Curated annotation (Swiss-Prot):
Cofactor requirement: FAD
Family, per entry: Belongs to the acyl-CoA dehydrogenase family.
The EC number(s) this enzyme carries: 1.14.13.187
Record's function text: Nitrososynthase involved in the biosynthesis of everninomicin, a broad spectrum orthosomycin antibiotic. Catalyzes the double-oxidation of TDP-L-evernosamine to TDP-L-evernitrosose. The enzyme first oxidizes the substrate to a transient hydroxylamino intermediate, which is then further oxidized to nitroso sugar. The nitroso group is probably spontaneously oxidized giving TDP-L-evernitrose. In vitro, catalyzes the double-oxidation of TDP-L-epi-vancosamine to TDP-L-epi-vancosonitrose.
Organism: Micromonospora sp. (strain ATCC 39149 / NRRL 15099 / SCC 1413)
Domain of life: Bacteria
One of the protein's GO biological processes: antibiotic biosynthetic process
Gene symbol of the encoding locus: evdC
Oligomer status and interactors: Homotetramer.
Protein name: L-evernosamine nitrososynthase
The organism's taxonomic lineage, starting at the top: Bacteria, Bacillati, Actinomycetota, Actinomycetes, Micromonosporales
Length: 421
C-alpha cells in the first residue's frame, strides 16, 4: 500500500489518477472505452447488459483491478483513483461503470477482510480475490430486500445455514458468480443479528430474474435475485453484529464500499457538459449571452462537484489506512465528508445535465439523444445508499446537533422490517 505522505498531491479534481496502479487501470480502460461508448445507446434502448465488455475486462485484468498485487490483481488501493477510473468509464456509459463499480467495491472490502478478518474469513477472501484477479469471479452485493420480504438465515442443523428471501436492485447480476447477501439471523433467545452469507450462483434454490426495466442505468444488469433455502457453508458467512448495536465503526467499510461511486455521477455530468458545449461551439458565430451564461455555469458547477468529491476521497484514503484511535470516530470521520460530497453531487450533477438540455434545446428532447440517457442515468445517484436524501439529512443533521441515533442504515432497515412484520 502506498504511503500517502510520500506523494506530491495535485488539485483533487478527478482529472487524472495519482498512483501508478491508477494510471495502469485508466490506460487499460482507454482501449475498451471506444466500443463501450459506441454501443451505449443501443444497450440503453434494449436494456441489455454488456457481457462482451466484461469479458474484455476479465482478459485485461480489470475485474481484479482492486485486488492486491500479491494475489494477482492490479493492486489499485487508492479510492481517489478508483473514482477517477469510474468517471472515465461513466463518460462513455454510466451503466457499465455502475456494474464495474460493484466488482471494484468487492475487491476493496474483501482486501480488508483478507488483511484483518478471522482465519476462515481471510481464507474465503483470498479464494475470491484470486478468482477475481484471474477473471473467473464476478461478485455482487445484494442489499435491498424486496417489498414485504425479510431475507433470513436459518440453521440447517448440521453447522451450516439455509438462506431464504428476495433481493432487488442487484447490479451486475447477469454475470455474477457469487452474491454477498445482506441477511438477518435470529439466535435462540430471539436476538437478531446481521450477517452476510456468500452464495454461489449455482447454489440450489438461487434464481436470478431477468426483469430489469429501469428508468435509467438500463444496461447495468440490475436484477432481482430469489433465495429459496440456499445452502451456505459456515466458513462463508460474515457476521456483522446485533441489530441496533449503534456501532459507527461500520461506517468506515460502508464508505470504502460506496464513495467511489461518486465518480460515476461526475462522469455523467462531464459527458453531458462536453456534448452541450461542443454543440454550442459548433453552431458557428458567437453564442448568445444566455448560452454563454449557461456554459460558464456548467463549468463552475462541474469544478465544484469534482473538487468536492476529490476532497472527500482524499479524506477517505487517509482515514482508511489509519487504524489507530477509536473505530467509531474513524467511521464518522470517513462517512461525514462522504455525505457532504454525495449531497453536493446529487444536487449539482442533475442540475448540470438539466442545463445541458436547455443549452442544446429541443433536439435533446428525444429518446435517442445521448443527453436523454444521461438525464435518466444521473437521477440514480439519489437512490444509492449510503445514504438516500432522507437518510443523509438524518445523518448529517444528527452529527451537527449531537443526536444519539443508529447511523448504520442496514441496522435501521432491519429494525423497521421487524417492527412492520
Amino acid at each position: 500500500m502506498s504511503n500517502l505522505t510520500e506523494e506530491r498531491w495535485v488539485a483533487a479534481d478527478l482529472r487524472a489518477p495519482l498512483t501508478p496502479a491508477g494510471r495502469t487501470v485508466v490506460d487499460l480502460l482507454a482501449g475498451v472505452i471506444p466500443r463501450i461508448s459506441a454501443e451505449a445507446a443501443d444497450r440503453d434502448r434494449t436494456g441489455t447488459f454488456p457481457v462482451e465488455a466484461f469479458e474484455q475486462f476479465a482478459k485485461l485484468g480489470l475485474m481484479g483491478a482492486t485486488v492486491p498485487a500479491e494475489l494477482g490483481g492490479l493492486g489499485l488501493t487508492r479510492l481517489y483513483d478508483v473514482a477517477t477510473a469510474l468517471m472515465r468509464l461513466a463518460e462513455a456509459d454510466a451503466s457499465t461503470a455502475l456494474a464495474w463499480h460493484v466488482q471494484l467495491s468487492r475487491g476493496l472490502t474483501l482486501t480488508y477482510e483478507w488483511q484483518h478478518g478471522t482465519p476462515p474469513v481471510r481464507a474465503m477472501a483470498e479464494r475470491l480475490l484470486r478468482a477475481m484477479a484471474e477473471g473467473e469471479a464476478a461478485v455482487c452485493g445484494a442489499l435491498k430486500d424486496a417489498p414485504g420480504v425479510v431475507t433470513e438465515l436459518h440453521s440447517d442443523g448440521a453447522g451450516g445455514w439455509l438462506l431464504s428471501g428476495r433481493k432487488v436492485l442487484v447490479s451486475m447480476a447477469p454475470i455474477a458468480t457469487h452474491f454477498f447477501v445482506h441477511a438477518q439471523r435470529r439466535d435462540d433467545d430471539g436476538s437478531v443479528f446481521l450477517a452476510v452469507p456468500v452464495v454461489h450462483r449455482d447454489a440450489p434454490g438461487l434464481t436470478v430474474l431477468d426483469n430489469w426495466d429501469g428508468l435509467g442505468m438500463r444496461a447495468s444488469g440490475t436484477l432481482e435475485v430469489v433465495f429459496d433455502r440456499c445452502p451456505v457453508r459456515a466458513d462463508e458467512l460474515l457476521e456483522r453484529g446485533p441489530v441496533g448495536a449503534r456501532r459507527d465503526a461500520v461506517l468506515a467499510g460502508q464508505t470504502v464500499s460506496s464513495i467511489t461511486m461518486l465518480g460515476i455521477y461526475a462522469g455523467i455530468a462531464q459527458a453531458a457538459r462536453d456534448i452541450a458545449v461542443g454543440f454550442c461551439a459548433g453552431r458557428g458565430g458567437e453564442p448568445r449571452a444566455g448560452a454563454r451564461a449557461l456554459v460558464a455555469g456548467l463549468d463552475t458547477r462541474l469544478y465544484a462537484l469534482r473538487t468536492t468529491v476529490g476532497a472527500a476521497l482524499t479524506n477517505a484514503d487517509a482515514a482508511s489506512v489509519d487504524l489507530s484511535g477509536d473505530p467509531d470516530e474513524r467511521g464518522r470521520r470517513m462517512m461525514t465528508p462522504f455525505q457532504y460530497a454525495k449531497m453536493t453531487v446529487n444536487e449539482l450533477a442533475p442540475a448540470v445535465v438539466d442545463d445541458c438540455l436547455s443549452l442544446v434545446g429541443g433536439l435533446a428532447y428525444t429518446a435517442g439523444h445521448p443527453l436523454s440517457r444521461l438525464y435518466r442515468d444521473v437521477r440514480a445517484g439519489g437512490f444509492m445508499q449510503p445514504y438516500s436524501y432522507v437518510d443523509a439529512v438524518d445523518y448529517l443533521s444528527g452529527q451537527a446537533l449531537g443526536l444519539d441515533r443508529d447511523n448504520d442504515y442496514m441496522s435501521v432497515r432491519a429494525l423497521r422490517s421487524r417492527t412492520s412484520a
